[in-house]
Amino acid sequence: MNRQPMFFILIVLLFTVFSLKEFIPNTFCIHPKEGIIHLEKEHPKTFCEKDEVHVKVLSEIKNLKVQLDLDKSFSFTSPFRISLSFVVLKKQNALPEKSPRRESPIKTVRLLI
């Protein structure tokens, strides 16, 4: 069994836990050539190297579950697609039922390449 997808899913789960608790890391840093994925805190002085990908999810909602789906042909040596989906865990009573913000709670999903 290939361990790279399992490792990637573990990182996603850790990222979710840290995000929900407002912990320091808030950005995935993916190094495809080395097969390394780690978490880091985005900082104004932090920038991407040319051989890495930063993925940061920005949201004003704190109670989120992040689900990450990979292509079946996932490999660090070839292009792959990442699909992120978000579920609000706690219902927000303050927003009206037909509020545009309720229908689309995520402000920004940004992929920096």
UniProtKB/Swiss-Prot annotation:
Membrane-spanning residues: 7-29
Principal localisation: membrane
Designated name of the protein: Uncharacterized protein aq_465
Annotated GO CC locations: membrane
Topology in the lipid bilayer: Single-pass membrane protein
Transmembrane recorded as keyword: yes
Subcellular location: Membrane
Organism: Aquifex aeolicus (strain VF5)
Keywords: Membrane, Transmembrane, Transmembrane helix
